Amino acid sequence: MFDLLGLRLLHYITFRTAYATIFAFLLALIFGPFIILRLKKLKLDQILREDGPKRHLSEKMGIPTMGGILIFFCVLVSLFFWINLWNVYFLIVLFVMISFACLGFMDDLLKIKRKNADGLNPRFKIYGQILFSCISVTMLYYFGGEHISIIYFPFFKSLKLDLGVLYIPFGMFILISASNSFNLTDGLDGLAIGLSIVVTGALVIIAYLTSRVDFATYLNIPNIKGSEELVIFLGALLGGSFGFLWFNAYPAKIMMGDTGSLSIGAVLGMTALILKSEILFAILAGVFVLETLSVIIQVAVYKKTKKRVFKMAPLHHHFEELGWSETQVVIRFWIIGLIFAIIALSTLKIR
């Protein structure tokens, strides 16, 4: 059918991925100004924490939030044209994206309504994350194929661990951790979305390699049937993220909000689960891990000694307090994120 219509190229994953990426990017450029204007008219402005860097209270006041809406709109419209909508992995990732985005949307809305940075009750927020991660990981466990409960370790050719049904709580931990660490990192113009572009780009490569029997056999990594549609999904996410960065780069015209940050983190975590890259993901998302550890260390040490290890947490604020400009922090963190990604990808061959 495709051949008769002269659409043979639609059989190729690389072609569909390329155009899903370009399409999502162009949609973001076209609809970005309209969405920013609409959010401003609705007075959906970013609510800033009073305990953050003082200059943020003046520089970032009045910037519209909930920018995740722009990303997901562009991604979903693009995917409608380029992806197999009934692929099981796509449906699971789609559920994760929508459910965590709704949770983040509620959080953003409450912050704006109450005019403070508290948002959802922390207990309700974590319960929501537990519920959505439990549903999605359980779906993955039962519909994800024979390899799904096996964990593969970087650097080791034959070292693997089959968790069985315990993979469900393990996967939930990955999902919730990824979601919250991304949320913590979203504190400077372009920081979180730039780092997510690096992680997403690396996952595109991994997804493509695992979808091909020849590459998977050569690299001694699992061949995951159906993961080729994840290449297209990640491509669209990459394009939407680049489009969002166009408006989120310093000085930002729009902020991602929890609508975007909670969801993108969870989506990347779920993608890592599907691609059997759970341990590799910890290396790939190294900057996000460091940001989260800085908060955990800061809180734990302060509770015990009443002293601070960092001038301010998360880690990006520590460097701001040391005198780095916002753009210096962002670009240097991007560079570090890229190094982590290169290390992670290199482990595919070092086995």
Swiss-Prot record:
Its EC number is 2.7.8.13. It comes from Borrelia hermsii (strain HS1 / DAH). InterPro entries: Glycosyl_transferase_4, PNAcMuramoyl-5peptid_Trfase, PNAcMuramoyl-5peptid_Trfase_CS. Its main location: membrane. Pathway: Cell wall biogenesis; peptidoglycan biosynthesis. This is Phospho-N-acetylmuramoyl-pentapeptide-transferase. It is found in: Cell inner membrane. Pfam families: Glycos_transf_4. GO terms for molecular function: metal ion binding; phospho-N-acetylmuramoyl-pentapeptide-transferase activity; UDP-N-acetylmuramoyl-L-alanyl-D-glutamyl-meso-2,6-diaminopimelyl-D-alanyl-D-alanine:undecaprenyl-phosphate transferase activity. One of its GO terms (biological process) is cell wall organization. Catalyzes the initial step of the lipid cycle reactions in the biosynthesis of the cell wall peptidoglycan: transfers peptidoglycan precursor phospho-MurNAc-pentapeptide from UDP-MurNAc-pentapeptide onto the lipid carrier undecaprenyl phosphate, yielding undecaprenyl-pyrophosphoryl-MurNAc-pentapeptide, known as lipid I. Keywords: Cell cycle, Cell division, Cell inner membrane, Cell membrane, Cell shape, Cell wall biogenesis/degradation, Magnesium, Membrane, Metal-binding, Peptidoglycan synthesis, Transferase, Transmembrane, Transmembrane helix. One of its GO terms (cellular component) is plasma membrane. It is a multi-pass membrane protein. Its cofactor is Mg(2+). Belongs to the glycosyltransferase 4 family. MraY subfamily. PANTHER family: PHOSPHO-N-ACETYLMURAMOYL-PENTAPEPTIDE-TRANSFERASE, PHOSPHO-N-ACETYLMURAMOYL-PENTAPEPTIDE-TRANSFERASE HOMOLOG. The chain crosses the membrane at residues 17-37, 63-83, 85-105, 135-155, 158-178, 190-210, 230-250, 254-274, 279-299, 328-348.
